[in-house]
Amino acid sequence: QTEGDDTQLPTMIKGLQSQVDYSTILDRILAKIDVSVDFKDMNYEQHGFYAIKEHAITINSRNSPVHTLKTLFHELAHHYHLDSLKGRRDKFTYEQEEFVAESSAYLVCATLGIDTGDYSIPYIKHWLNDFQAFQEMRRDIEKTVGKIMKLLPEEEEQTNKNKEEKI
């Protein structure tokens, strides 16, 4: 057995952390989305997944609260982006779809003041092989982020508007 506290663990081991009102945001999103969400005990490497045919998201119940929220945003990005591609799903590769989903999740989290950069930036870089492809996917990311942002509690939206006005 080891001694010490979790502040001595690297971020990737202990999971994403933040001082966000996790439960309010999560409850609001779960009440508004048109896809089922289930929380299950999974291995530590798997944070969640979106099953397109079942129209369902599964999230690892072992995730930290913030990683749960980030994963929900990532899987919702898959849901909304794939739904918007009706008739042209073959246009995007698996790598590009992962890039869109994680970029969207990262941007939504950043808007909420949640820093997921230690996790998200390397993940995004892993999937980005072609800068030209990024330019083509930018609009898809913007649309996907917009759809997720509409799910946030009004007080979060107002906080974000106030932040934007100060900039």
Where are these regions (language model features)?
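Contiguous, non-catalytic segments that form substrate-binding/exosite surfaces or channel walls
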Residues: 1-65
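Active-site metal-coordination segments of metallo-dependent hydrolases
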Residues: 87-102, 110
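Long, well-structured alpha-helical subdomains associated
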Residues: 93, 106-165
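Non-Sec secretion/translocation targeting segments of pathogen effectors
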Residues: 101, 164-167
